[in-house]
Amino acid sequence: MASIPATVAAVPQTNMVAPFTGLKANAAFPVTKKVNGFSTLPSNGGRVQCMKVWPPVGKKKYETLSYLPELTEAQLAKEVDYLLRNKWVPCLEFELEHGFVYRENASSPGYYDGRYWTMWKLPMFGCTDSAQVMKELQECKKEYPQAWIRIIGFDNVRQVQCVSFIASKPTGF
């Protein structure tokens, strides 16, 4: 028998993938370079035009909000409403000699400065109205007219003092 050479036809493969040639810059994600200047930062400059703080020279620092002018009765009542809304217990404290920050019982720097203020009555557990706190403030001012008086707010769940601000200062301070 004679052999007949078989002819095999090459079948073209249509599912071949082109070889990986690397990433092409900016092919899929067009990116424009953004200049990060100060003009793109958020600002409240349009709303606050002439904000002036308490002068830093010759003025003693007291507590929270001490850089602002003295609060009015209405502003104090709003601050007390804030601490009542947060379920904090209001309390009044007063100091007759040193209302400003100084070191007496501790020499290390930090939040606590080592001073102790005298508590006016007991903390006002169950207080729900800022008028009650303002009435106690007036009584304390009447009893000690030359005292620094501050209102503090305690969180009795976490057992920490959350807010403290000066409510009254002696004349001349």
From Swiss-Prot:
One further remark on this entry is: The basic functional RuBisCO is composed of a large chain homodimer in a 'head-to-tail' conformation. In form I RuBisCO this homodimer is arranged in a barrel-like tetramer with the small subunits forming a tetrameric 'cap' on each end of the 'barrel'.
State the family it belongs to. Belongs to the RuBisCO small chain family.
Functionally, this protein is described as follows: RuBisCO catalyzes two reactions: the carboxylation of D-ribulose 1,5-bisphosphate, the primary event in carbon dioxide fixation, as well as the oxidative fragmentation of the pentose substrate. Both reactions occur simultaneously and in competition at the same active site. Although the small subunit is not catalytic it is essential for maximal activity.
Q: Which UniProt keywords apply?
A: Calvin cycle, Carbon dioxide fixation, Chloroplast, Photorespiration, Photosynthesis, Plastid, Transit peptide
Instruction: List the Gene Ontology MF annotations in alphabetical order.
Output: ribulose-bisphosphate carboxylase activity
| Name of the protein | Ribulose bisphosphate carboxylase small subunit, chloroplastic
Gene Ontology biological-process entries? photorespiration; reductive pentose-phosphate cycle
Q: Name one Pfam family in it.
A: RbcS
Q: Which residue ranges run through the membrane?
A: none
Cite the Gene3D superfamilies for this sequence: Ribulose bisphosphate carboxylase, small subunit
